[in-house]
């Protein structure tokens, strides 16, 4: 088995910004020259996450509204008292969704469903430079 580690850099808008990173991950897998294995994506930071979703405008709207219902932005959070930042909800949302995702690949192709894309989600309250660590294990 071979391990290859790469990085994907992003500029996000914050506030539940959802970015389709599927093509970037496909490119990294293709360039790895590994034929079959798994690719693990890890988001650096505690206010962003990664998942799969059908990247469709109305579903993305539903996705954002769901987070506002589950973990509302405009209620008191103890964390907000710590640093004076109003992003307690951002940390909670990111921890619930999670910082990592693993996708298998065969013949250098990700084994995703037809309507399944890899989505980076930034829950923080401001634009940020973000980083996804991509680690490929395969042969």
Q: Where would I find each of the regions flagged by the language model?
A:
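Active-site histidine-anchored catalytic micro-motif
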Residues: 1-139
């Amino acid at each position: 088995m071979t391990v290859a580690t790469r990085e994907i850099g992003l500029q996000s808008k914050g506030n539940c910004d959802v970015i389709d990173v599927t093509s970037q991950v496909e490119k990294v897998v293709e360039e790895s020259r590994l034929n079959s294995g798994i690719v693990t994506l890890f988001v650096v930071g505690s206010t962003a996450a990664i998942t799969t979703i059908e990247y469709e405008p109305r579903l993305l709207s539903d996705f954002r509204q769901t987070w506002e219902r589950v973990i509302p932005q405009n209620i008191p959070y103890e964390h907000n008292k710590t640093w004076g930042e109003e992003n307690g909800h951002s940390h909670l949302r990111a921890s619930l969704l999670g910082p990592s995702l693993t996708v298998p690949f065969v013949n250098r192709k990700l084994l995703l469903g037809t309507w399944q894309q890899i989505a980076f989600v930034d829950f923080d309250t401001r634009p940020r430079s973000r980083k996804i660590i991509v680690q490929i294990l395969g042969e």
